[in-house]
């Protein structure tokens, strides 16, 4: 391969999206007589997120459905503007053929960005499909990750809906209720799912595991060690390379002498570790930390002051 080809693709992509950004800003500033206002709230490799509040305010529509209908038509006009400017770009770079096209994806009334490619949108229309009730589009946020405990996935989605449509007090009340429910769940429901790799690499005959062992691998090695110590390997299979596991933090002190344990399906009762599950740490890391990533952006708290 030739690195210059890769660089050319990257630079061409950057030029294309920036060209579209300039075209949309110029069109909206001219249409709304706003001078040099930046209407682009976020950009990605091949997409623009455009704020059209000023346009909606100008026409004086308040009915939500009519606003969505108006924005659908307005986006059609913006598509035409982008197409015209891409024709000019093709001529500018002496392109063999003009192949660049941008289409409207979603219409949303609320959006929260925590970082690049990490956002929540309250979507009313997606590529021409109109929703009776708005649906959340969640990208890069913890709720949609497979590493999030099962007990938290739906609750994170629910609380994101509250953040979009409710108040800070509503959010705090939900957290308080879910925390009470969370502390009543079993270990399997609150543990972090992972795939375990490197059991041989990180195993140490003297100390069970080596330094810098990933926490879920550490928990797996401890689990296997306890099985062998308690002579339970005929009753429960050991954790093997490549298997799916779940790990949870433990209160200190506890019978393992460590802060974590991993399992495959369920925690063997012979381990006698149920009362040592650290629900406070699990709740903080599985629910509060990803939630704070969103709440910090809008200046809300997770508890009453």
Regions found by a protein language model. Give the residues of each.
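DNA-dependent DNA polymerase catalytic subunits
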Residues: 2, 10-43, 52-305
